[in-house]
UniProtKB/Swiss-Prot annotation:
Keyword Metal-binding listed: no
A Pfam family the protein falls into: DNA_mis_repair
A GO cellular component annotation in the UniProt record: mismatch repair complex
Gene3D superfamilies for this protein: 3.30.230.10, Histidine kinase-like ATPase, C-terminal domain, MutL, C-terminal domain, dimerisation subdomain, MutL, C-terminal domain, regulatory subdomain
Biological process (GO), any one: mismatch repair
Its job: This protein is involved in the repair of mismatches in DNA. It is required for dam-dependent methyl-directed DNA mismatch repair. May act as a 'molecular matchmaker', a protein that promotes the formation of a stable complex between two or more DNA-binding proteins in an ATP-dependent manner without itself being part of a final effector complex.
Transmembrane segments: none
Listed GO MF terms: ATP binding; ATP hydrolysis activity; ATP-dependent DNA damage sensor activity; mismatched DNA binding
Homology family: Belongs to the DNA mismatch repair MutL/HexB family.
UniProt gene name: mutL
Name of the protein in its database record: DNA mismatch repair protein MutL
PROSITE patterns with a match to the protein in the record: DNA_MISMATCH_REPAIR_1
InterPro entries, alphabetized: DNA_mismatch_repair_CS, DNA_mismatch_repair_MutL, DNA_mismatch_S5_2-like, HATPase_C_sf, MutL/Mlh/PMS, MutL/Mlh/Pms-like, MutL_C, MutL_C_dimsub
Alphabetized NCBIfam families for the sequence: mutl
């Protein structure tokens, strides 16, 4: 006797419901997406008891006639596709014909619908069984009411959370849909009151302002970048604001909200060297790729997708966010064009407080005085070294290369016309200058660290740096772990300008070193860098380069307490202005702080 039997349709429907209908929020998502697929421009949602007793979705979409309303309750009945070929690049939210019958199998469901040409239809279903059909007077559109969700599946019912928890999940689901379809008016009522009301808007910022509040949206910079066939747009949190509010992450791929840790990690990688380790930014990103490059039919709830070629896509996302942060950092956040001009009322040759400066310190383009006195820095514009980005353009990415070249050219032009204001050093730690709108302070170590990081990263990715041979070579005796760290990064150290030979056992003979500034302590910097790189052998080449560049920049930069000459201060100012992300060092700390005259007046009681 056979022990294998085909399950009854009611049982099969409940199994399918377990994949599609996890909780009330899942029902809301599926039914609202059906409304949007029907062309609705207005969707009203009614929730009672967190969706446990009632979920009602009413729309003004195309509606259905009587036959389609009944047929829609059958598994795999859909109007979205008719062949397997249409699965490639499908743009509708739904296409499997599973959600509505799955919901009907675990609830008491009622459908009222009317198409443009037909009369209204009423359909009632009890736990998957059709109990009533008839006619009803109504306008075009569809209203789906779901009562007593999971009433016939006690095992599922007992896993329902409190009404408050289920309501929060519904709000989260609706926020994702609201961001996705900004052209639709959504109204959500909960227990008799209007809880959410989002009129149709034209921009992402406007929708997020309605969802989160205008103040929250101010924390974000715009992302809009095209690389080849990939278009990345949206909003990314400003580095200085990361960690100051609730973290929110929303990823939209080809008009569908999805979960993809790889793309989110790629976007977060753009923040490396701008925020402290362990902190994660808020992101709202929209990614558009050709339909044939993405498979949406890989998850029961269509919450995950599969990409044909993931690596170029992740690179495009990272580069888009990095560019957005760079443009913000170099203009809106710092405002070099605004803050670099010296006050017209101040006599030339005097900085804040009337302290005289050397006449040479006021020239628009002074020769670097020690701080960048390497052959490369003497022979090339500082901007060409400092504008290096964390992702070097490759031969197969012509668009990216052209954009990077344009950024460098723009930076070079700005550096040619940049007027360095009179600078003074405070406590051998900060540089300060005055502007019509306030006072600006620069942390000399953090600023130099940022400059060196971008220079070193560019050197590691594009070629070797010049070095200076030592009259008396250094002998370093390393421990086993330090020696292993050196072997893991040997080629990178050579690119940075070190010439190092083995000297027996774990000893090294250092013949030549880079010289980022006259006070550079090569032996200490090399030892400290190797100590910080212990255990980094297994990382990718790109991660190793970033880690080494950040660590070496931190160790090699001038320190608090180092006296700087006027020429060195000007050189640092110019180099920082030419970096991609001037506002933060490699640890995410601020390099620049500005105090407006209004703030100073308030502190002194003048306002």
């Amino acid at each position: 006797m056979s022990r294998i039997a085909i399950l009854p349709s009611a049982v099969a429907d409940q199994i399918a419901a377990g994949e599609v209908v996890e909780r009330p929020a899942s029902v809301v998502k599926e039914l609202v997406e059906n409304a949007l697929d029907a062309g609705a421009t207005s969707v009203d949602i009614t929730i009672e008891d967190g969706g446990r007793t009632l979920i009602r979705i009413a729309d003004n979409g195309s509606g259905m006639d009587g036959a389609d309303a009944v047929l829609a309750l059958s598994r795999h009945a859909t109007s979205k596709i008719t062949s397997a070929e249409q699965l490639v690049g499908v743009r509708s939210f739904g296409f499997r014909g599973e959600a509505l019958p799955a919901i009907a199998s675990v609830s008491e469901l009622q459908i009222e619908t009317a198409s443009e040409d037909g009369s209204g239809t009423l359909v009632r279903v009890q736990a998957g069984t059709l109990t009533e059909t008839g006619q009803v007077a109504r306008r075009q559109g569809t209203t789906v009411s779901v009562h007593r969700l999971f009433h016939n599946t006690p095992a599922r019912l007992k896993f329902m959370r409190s009404a408050r928890s289920e309501w929060r999940a519904i709000v989260d689901a609706m926020q994702a849909i609201g961001v996705l379809r900004r052209d639709v008016h959504f109204t959500v009522r909960h227990d008799g009151r209007v809880a959410l009301d989002w009129p149709a808007v034209s921009t992402l910022r406007a929708r997020l302002a309605a969802l989160w509040g205008a103040a929250d949206v101010e924390r974000f910079v715009d992302v809009d970048d095209v690389q080849g066939v990939v278009h990345v747009s949206g909003l990314a949190e400003r580095p200085a604001d990361v960690g100051t509010a609730t973290r929110r992450v929303l990823l939209i791929v080809n008009g569908r909200v999805v979960r993809d840790h790889g793309l989110i990690r790629a976007a977060e990688a753009a923040y490396r060297s701008t925020i402290p380790a362990g902190m994660r930014p808020s992101l709202v990103l929209q990614v558009h790729v050709p339909g044939g490059d993405v498979d949406v039919n890989v998850h029961p709830a269509k919450a995950e997708v599969r990409f044909r070629d993931r690596w170029p896509l992740e690179r495009a996302v990272e580069e888009a966010v990095r560019r957005a942060l760079g443009l913000f950092d170099a203009s809106a956040g710092i405002g070099w064009r605004t803050w670099s001009a010296a006050p017209a009322s101040r006599e030339p040759g005097h900085a804040l407080g009337g302290i005289p400066l050397e006449p040479s310190a006021l020239r628009a383009a002074p020769a670097p005085e020690g701080l960048f006195a390497t052959p490369a820095a003497a022979d090339a514009n500082l901007a060409q070294h400092a504008i290096a980005t964390a992702t070097a353009p490759t031969a197969d990415d012509l668009t990216s290369a052209m954009q990077v070249d344009a950024m460098r050219a723009e930076a070079a032009r700005e550096m040619e016309t940049l007027v360095v204001p009179p600078l003074m050093q405070l406590r051998k730690t900060y540089l300060m200058f005055e502007h019509d709108e306030g006072v600006v302070l620069i942390d000399q170590h953090s600023a130099h660290e940022r400059v060196l990081y971008e220079q070193f990263l560019g050197v590691l990715e594009r070629g070797e740096a010049p070095s200076q041979r030592l009259l008396f070579p250094l002998t370093l005796h390393l421990g086993p772990q330090e020696a292993d760290a050196f072997e893991a990064h040997r080629d990178a150290f050579v690119r940075l300008g070190f010439e190092i030979d083995h000297f027996g056992g774990t000893s090294l003979l250092v013949q030549a070193v880079p010289m980022p500034h006259p006070r550079f302590d090569a032996e200490r910097c090399l030892r400290d860098t190797l100590a910080a790189l212990i255990g980094d052998r297994g990382a990718s080449a790109a991660a190793k380069h970033e880690r080494l560049a950040a660590t070496f920049a931190c160790k090699a930069a001038i320190k608090a307490g180092d006296q700087m000459s006027p020429g060195e201060m000007q050189a640092l100012y110019r180099a920082l202005a030419a970096t991609v992300l001037p506002a933060h060092d490699v640890h995410g700390r601020s390099t620049i702080v500005r105090l407006s005259w209004d703030e100073l007046d308030r502190r002194f009681g003048r306002k």
